[in-house]
Swiss-Prot record:
<dbReference type="GO" id="GO:0043278">
    <property type="term" value="P:response to morphine"/>
</dbReference>
<comment type="similarity">
    <text>Belongs to the phosphatase 2A regulatory subunit B family.</text>
</comment>
<dbReference type="GO" id="GO:0140767">
    <property type="term" value="F:enzyme-substrate adaptor activity"/>
</dbReference>
<dbReference type="GO" id="GO:0000159">
    <property type="term" value="C:protein phosphatase type 2A complex"/>
</dbReference>
<dbReference type="GO" id="GO:0006470">
    <property type="term" value="P:protein dephosphorylation"/>
</dbReference>
<dbReference type="GO" id="GO:0044877">
    <property type="term" value="F:protein-containing complex binding"/>
</dbReference>
<dbReference type="GO" id="GO:0098978">
    <property type="term" value="C:glutamatergic synapse"/>
</dbReference>
<keyword id="KW-0853">WD repeat</keyword>
<keyword id="KW-0677">Repeat</keyword>
<dbReference type="InterPro" id="IPR036322">
    <property type="entry name" value="WD40_repeat_dom_sf"/>
</dbReference>
<dbReference type="InterPro" id="IPR018067">
    <property type="entry name" value="PP2A_PR55_CS"/>
</dbReference>
<dbReference type="GO" id="GO:0051983">
    <property type="term" value="P:regulation of chromosome segregation"/>
</dbReference>
<feature type="repeat" description="WD 5">
    <location>
        <begin position="288"/>
        <end position="325"/>
    </location>
</feature>
<protein>
    <recommendedName>
        <fullName>Serine/threonine-protein phosphatase 2A 55 kDa regulatory subunit B alpha isoform</fullName>
    </recommendedName>
</protein>
<feature type="modified residue" description="N-acetylalanine">
    <location>
        <position position="2"/>
    </location>
</feature>
<dbReference type="GO" id="GO:0051721">
    <property type="term" value="F:protein phosphatase 2A binding"/>
</dbReference>
<feature type="repeat" description="WD 4">
    <location>
        <begin position="227"/>
        <end position="270"/>
    </location>
</feature>
């Protein structure tokens, strides 16, 4: 499987697993988002309990190639608390829907995190010195009586144990009527967008009390509503361009230079439906759960229920590549509809060189597709392979007929074990995969 480096086949091996082993998982511990920062040295996860946990790549071990995939807890903080909307009598969950890192400009790191309604800008900074020797203040912070000061001292900085502080710098609230599903930082690093089911807003990172509505698909009569916005993202290089996907399987590319309200798209990406595949579930499974631009900005990837599609921005009428993630589930759509799994929102990600794409599946399986060799592989995130440097064995699912020894039957897949969130290190072959409440880190095997 090709990775950040290019076309050679890669053996993936286990590096770490984070989180408790319990079968009885608390709802608050379920991981809801995973994101590497721009250098890959930090990895953030958000959970349903409103917490953000940041892991840092082991600095000493970066030189030792077999330990590159070791991450240790750097900072943990409560990003969002549960709230109650008294006007609508609605509870607002604390669950973190998305995390996005800003590029590092100084010693501190900044990230955006959002729940259903409120976006917060967090500053993550280190402190390893503290001031000492104030004239009018005791070491515990109490003020002295100025009349007791007989000599003047020059305050000095003394070394202390490293402290990592997370402080909220901005809170962007009261701009979304519906649940926020996406945030995306613009390539100008000054603005970002936030999208809910029917609207997309544009924000400036310094201004919290005002945002511009750039897309509004809400009909005058809500009975005429036929689709909702499912994801949105800014282009990585062109600061005026963004895309948003819909529950009908379409992707619209908009140019903010054309008009203030981008209700008219510049391009519409849509694949004509094959009439022979039409069924009751067609519209549900064509809903796009994630859209991601390639690092180069030439392509974008979309994930629907059964497949991953790669689109060339210059070709709207069909994708240039389609990869079947779990086609063997097509015959199971009826039972997946009954247990609500058909509404699961799987995400997808690119590797650093845009040559491989990755997405999750059921039974704690995740899939990789090599765009150059057209090879694909299914791997499993499991504690059975949890010795460091254990090479992951490819898994195969048997759809029908006789099952070979190393295959797993489609009927024995566990639909409660699912990988919705994955992330790929921007520069190395290190991947982070979230199962229910565990974070697995895998890396390529280096001889």
């Amino acid at each position: 499987m090709a990775g950040a480096g290019g076309g050679n086949d890669i053996q993936w091996c286990f590096s770490q697993v984070k989180g408790a082993v319990d079968d009885d998982v608390a709802e608050a511990d379920i991981i809801s988002t995973v994101e590497f920062n721009h250098s890959g040295e930090l990895l953030a996860t958000g959970d349903k309990g409103g917490r953000v946990v940041i892991f840092q790549q082991e600095q000493e071990n970066k030189i030792q190639s077999h330990s590159r995939g070791e991450y240790n807890v750097y900072s943990t903080f409560q990003s969002h608390e549960p709230e109650f909307d008294y006007l609508k009598s609605l509870e607002i969950e604390e669950k973190i829907n998305k995390i996005r890192w800003l590029p590092q400009k100084n010693a501190a790191q900044f990230l955006l995190s959002t729940n259903d309604k409120t976006i917060k800008l967090w500053k993550i900074s280190e402190r390893d010195k503290r001031p000492e020797g104030y004239n009018l203040k005791e070491e515990d912070g109490r003020y002295r009586d100025p009349t007791t000061v007989t000599t003047l001292r020059v305050p000095v900085f003394r070394p202390m144990d490293l402290m990592v502080e997370a402080s909220p710098r901005r809170i962007f609230a009261n701009a979304h009527t519906y649940h926020i599903n996406s945030i995306s930082i613009n390539s100008d690093y000054e603005t970002y967008l936030s999208a809910d089911d029917l609207r997309i807003n544009l924000w400036h990172l310094e201004i919290t009390d005002r945002s511009f509505n750039i897309v509004d698909i809400k009909p005058a009569n809500m009975e005429e509503l036929t689709e909702v916005i499912t994801a949105a993202e800014f282009h990585p290089n062109s600061c005026n361009t963004f895309v948003y996907s819909s529950s009908k399987g379409t992707i619209r590319l908009c140019d903010m230079r054309a008009s203030a309200l981008c209700d008219r798209h510049s391009k519409l990406f849509e694949e004509p439906e094959d009439p022979s595949n039409r069924s009751f579930f067609s519209e549900i499974i064509s809903s796009i759960s994630d859209v991601k631009f390639s690092h180069s900005g030439r392509y974008m990837m979309t994930r629907d229920y059964l497949s991953v599609k790669i689109w060339d921005l210059n070709m709207e009428n069909r994708p240039v590549e389609t990869y079947q993630v779990h086609e063997y589930l097509r015959s199971k759509l009826c039972s997946l509809y009954e247990n609500d799994c058909i509404f699961d929102k799987f995400e997808c990600c690119w590797n650093g060189s845009d040559s491989v794409v990755m997405t999750g599946s059921y039974n704690n399986f995740f899939r990789m597709f090599d765009r150059n060799t057209k090879r694909d592989i299914t791997l499993e995130a499991s504690r059975e392979n949890n010795k460091p440097r254990t090479v992951l064995k490819p898994r195969k699912v048997c759809a029908s007929g006789k099952r070979k020894k190393d295959e797993i039957s489609v009927d024995s897949l566990d639909f409660n074990k699912k990988i919705l969130h994955t992330a790929w290190h921007p520069k190395e072959n290190i991947i982070a995969v979230a199962t229910t409440n565990n974070l697995y880190i895998f890396q390529d095997k280096v001889n």
